[in-house]
Amino acid sequence: MYPPEEKVRLGLDLKGGVHMVLRVQTDDALRIETETSLERVREILEVRSIGVGAMTMESPTRFRIEGVSPAQDAEFRAITDEQLLVVYRRESSAGGRYAFEMRPNMAVSLREESVRQALQTIERRVNELGVNEPIVAPHGVGGDQILVQLPGVSDVARAKEIIRSTALLELKLVEQGPAISRETLLQANGGRLPDGMEVVPGTDDTLTPGAAPQSVFYLVRRVAAITGRDLRTARSTLDEYNQPAVSFLLNGDGARKFGNITSQNIGRQLAIILDGRVYSAPVIESRITDEGRITGYFSQEEAADLGLVLRSGALPASLTYLEERRVGPTLGADSVRAGILA
């Protein structure tokens, strides 16, 4: 007689584990597309010296640009024709005011693609966890739900955190900071957030030597120099103080961009941001091409889990848990014994 595991596929009913239904927040994917489009146009307008007034995002699918001068209106239209009109419809009104609304077919396509990407990312993360014969599949009729079944998983909390972690890695040049408050950071600009910038929170242990780490804020470029899409791989490691950290390698395109950014900004800080929080902001001391390291206050397990989710890729949108059912090992063991006796 052989152990049942070698002969029978042991699902939740036999092995125990967890059954979950998740919803992909597809509005996130639309918002990211709109934010990226708006910032891309902002940068092009600055390079072309085309002055505009307010640039405002009104919803995940709509933004507005105002104050286009009549003398530059034709050039503005040409730029937005090239950069935006495949994805957005343009509306114009008096006074150089323009609104851009995402085309309905593009919104549907982006929502569907975000669910497909989320499903693939979850599959990779579950496989890295070493779960035997998991189920990751579309679920329900709304098109935005994913079924996950993990047989034999005992640490459900860890599995849930790994699955839902957005793992959005961004490397951004620091304009100012760290500062102890958002208000202090923006004082130099009259309390106003400069165009093309954002304030990101983080933790810093260098402001007061020997003191506990404290919350700080950084003013950084809104558009990232490097993102998780540029990663080739990531692994847990140790830093120079023998503390857990995560090292990463960039792909060819990422290495080229990283080399350009670091060579042109020696002496400046580069913020390493994960899910909207600065983990470290080292000073660029020389040109760097294909590798870097994320330091923080990680346990060994946290560093290993971070390496796992970075390797598997960032989620295109956040996830929420709609349903969770746990099947205990006692029920699973009873089911196996009943099958053998039958």
PLM segments and residue spans:
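Short, exposed interaction patches on small structured surface elements
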Residues: 27, 31, 105, 299, ...
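Membrane-embedded translocation segments of transport machinery
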Residues: 268, 280-316, 329
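Non-transmembrane, solvent-exposed regions of membrane trafficking/translocation machinery
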Residues: 25-283
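Hydrophobic alpha-helical transmembrane signal-anchor segments
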Residues: 1-16
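Juxtamembrane "pre-transmembrane" interface segments
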Residues: 149, 302-342
